[in-house]
């Protein structure tokens, strides 16, 4: 037993050593390569399985039910109470001011719009989110914008910023230089249309005859709807009387029947009479006789006059309507209906209270944004950022290059879907509040007036400043514009290749003024400048200013 145990152990050890020597890189590299390949496939399978598991996990989650189960109104009310109590809103103000000081928000906006990949992602997100807007009630948002004044502050800060008009003008100039107004697609473009002609019958050849088969005569007769022989009606009445045992003489097929109906309205009722039915036979249709609620046998049809008393019918129906039923079931139903009306009133009140929670929270947040410097710094960053300006030009180029399809898409849009949005906007009072604030803002009116005058009267101001100079100084004209206008005429003043790099600005202005006063010649530099700027200039600068004005008004809207 002991010898067999030792022998078995030695044999197992030798087998293990021999197996280790077989699987070595030197002895079997192919086996190692296969093993590495199998490991790669195993990793791929494991990665694929992991993705499938994650995908299945996300697909099994019902996001709609989760979102619907969230009580947003209660959460909004709790959050608003947390912000307004103990003046905790100061923390939100500090956070927004910090974001404004770091320029993080405008940098993110500029980067997302200037980068092609991120811009495409933003566009896809916006397109996917548009259908969800119709399921959201925008009234709390509009009311919060009005109560907080955020909408007006945004537009007013944009207009009051001194860099807004130069930004708009530069965008328009870049568009004009690039020739991006692709109006050819709208006015001069070519289009092809294929029309398939459908063969239809002319109205003159449409058969309007409808055949009616009258089975009262000895033989079947087909007659047109436009030429029906009224004698067939007499035949029908005659056959009806024959079927009920009255053997009166049948009316001939060629009988001419004349019917006259008169209606008489009195306080008692209305009498309907059918008179003057004369034929070659014995039948005389005088009228219908009998009470209104009593049926008349066919054998008595047309025998004696009949008076239909509609007043009696109205009295009966009125009595039935006024009758009260002592029904326990109906009383219980009325009681339940009253309770449901009370429950509906409570639900409406709760719904309004919950909607007020959302409005209060949005108003609190929007008011904090309006108080902070976030809007002002964001606008200042964007209107002075060259990358953002290039992005705006690029986006407008794409719009104008496809203006034909853009207008077609606008015309084909179902604008009726925006009716709830427009109604919410009008009912919120945001527009009236915005207009009222604008009319009462003296600073805004002054800025608008200065912007308009600076655009349309730039050349006049330039000329007036030169003419009105009295002490060699310029009061309101930018010195850079003045130097740019006269630099080409003053090469002799500096003596260094016609530039003003080394000439003092005050000395330069005094020199020009002294030259104008002493020489009084028509060839002076100032007079040359005046003659060049006299009249109205309709060059590219004029058109660019016009487009800049339109762009400014568009941004205001």
Curated annotation (Swiss-Prot):
Post-translational changes noted in the entry: Substrate for cleavage by KEX2 in vitro.
GO cellular component, as recorded: plasma membrane; side of membrane
Glycosylation sites: 62, 116, 284, 309, 376, 471, 520
Alphabetic keyword roster: Cell membrane, Coiled coil, Glycoprotein, GPI-anchor, Lipoprotein, Membrane, Signal, Virulence
Signal found in the keyword field: yes
Main function: Predicted GPI-anchored protein which may have a role during host infection.
Protein name, UniProt field: Predicted GPI-anchored protein 17
Lipid-acceptor residues (GPI-anchor amidated asparagine): 533
Induction notes from the record: Up-regulated upon milbemycins A3 oxim derivative (A3Ox) treatment, upon interaction of cells with host macrophages, and during oralpharyngeal candidiasis. Repressed by alpha pheromone.
Entry annotated with the keyword Signal: yes
Species of the source: Candida albicans (strain SC5314 / ATCC MYA-2876)
Gene transcribed to yield this protein: PGA17
Localization in the cell: Cell membrane
Coiled coil segments of this chain: 320-355
Annotated signal peptide: 1-19
Membrane topology: Lipid-anchor; GPI-anchor
Cleaved propeptide residues: 534-557
């Amino acid at each position: 037993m002991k010898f067999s145990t030792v022998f078995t152990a030695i044999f197992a050890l030798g087998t293990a050593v021999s197996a280790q020597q077989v699987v070595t890189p030197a002895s079997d590299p192919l086996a190692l390569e296969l093993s590495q390949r199998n490991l790669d496939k195993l990793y791929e399978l494991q990665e694929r399985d992991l993705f499938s598991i994650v995908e299945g996990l996300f697909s099994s989650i019902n996001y709609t039910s989760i979102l619907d189960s969230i009580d947003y109104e209660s959460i909004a009310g709790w959050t608003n109470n947390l912000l307004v109590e103990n003046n905790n809103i100061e923390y939100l103000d500090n956070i927004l001011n910090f974001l404004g000081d770091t320029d993080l928000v405008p940098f993110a906006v500029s980067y997302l719009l200037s980068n092609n990949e991120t811009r495409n992602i933003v566009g896809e997100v916006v397109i996917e989110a548009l259908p969800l807007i119709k399921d959201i009630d925008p009234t709390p948002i509009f009311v919060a914008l009005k109560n907080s004044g955020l909408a007006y502050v945004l537009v007013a800060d944009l207009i009051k910023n001194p860099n807004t008009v130069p930004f708009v003008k530069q965008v328009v100039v870049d568009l004009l230089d690039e020739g991006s107004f692709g109006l050819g697609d709208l006015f001069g473009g070519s289009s092809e249309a294929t029309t398939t002609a459908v063969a239809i019958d002319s109205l003159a050849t449409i058969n309007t005859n409808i055949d009616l088969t009258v089975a009262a005569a000895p033989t079947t007769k087909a007659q047109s709807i436009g030429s029906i022989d009224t004698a067939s009606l007499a035949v029908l009445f005659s056959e009806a009387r024959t079927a009920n045992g009255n053997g009166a003489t049948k009316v001939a097929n060629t009988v001419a029947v004349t019917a006259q109906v008169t209606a008489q309205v009195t306080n008692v009722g209305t009498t309907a009479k059918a008179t003057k039915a004369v034929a070659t036979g014995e039948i005389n249709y005088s009228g219908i006789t009998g009470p209104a609620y009593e049926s008349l046998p066919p054998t008595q049809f047309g025998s004696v006059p009949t008076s239909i008393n509609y007043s009696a019918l109205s009295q009966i129906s009125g009595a039935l309507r006024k009758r009260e039923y002592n029904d326990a079931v109906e009383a219980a139903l009325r009681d339940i209906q009253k309770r449901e009306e009370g429950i509906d009133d409570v639900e409406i009140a709760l719904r309004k209270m919950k909607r007020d929670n959302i409005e209060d929270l949005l108003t609190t947040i929007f008011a904090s944004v309006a108080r902070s410097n976030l809007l002002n710094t964001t606008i200042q960053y964007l209107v002075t950022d060259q990358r953002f300006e290039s992005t705006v030009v690029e986006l407008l180029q794409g719009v104008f290059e496809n203006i034909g399809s853009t207008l077609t898409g606008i015309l084909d849009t179902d604008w009726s879907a925006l009716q709830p949005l427009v109604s919410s906007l009008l009912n919120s009072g945001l527009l009236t509040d915005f207009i009222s604030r604008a009319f009462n803002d003296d600073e805004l009116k002054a800025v608008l007036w200065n912007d308009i005058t600076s655009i349309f009267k730039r050349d006049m101001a330039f000329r007036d400043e030169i003419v009105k100079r009295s002490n060699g100084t310029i009061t309101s004209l930018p010195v850079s514009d003045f130097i740019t206008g006269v630099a080409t005429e003053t090469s002799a003043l500096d003596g260094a290749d016609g530039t003003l790099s080394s000439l003092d600005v005050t000395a330069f202005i005094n020199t020009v003024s002294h030259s104008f006063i002493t020489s009084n010649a028509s060839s002076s530099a100032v007079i040359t400048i005046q003659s060049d700027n006299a009249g109205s200039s309709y060059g590219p600068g004029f058109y660019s200013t016009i487009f800049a004005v339109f762009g400014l008004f568009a941004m205001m809207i």
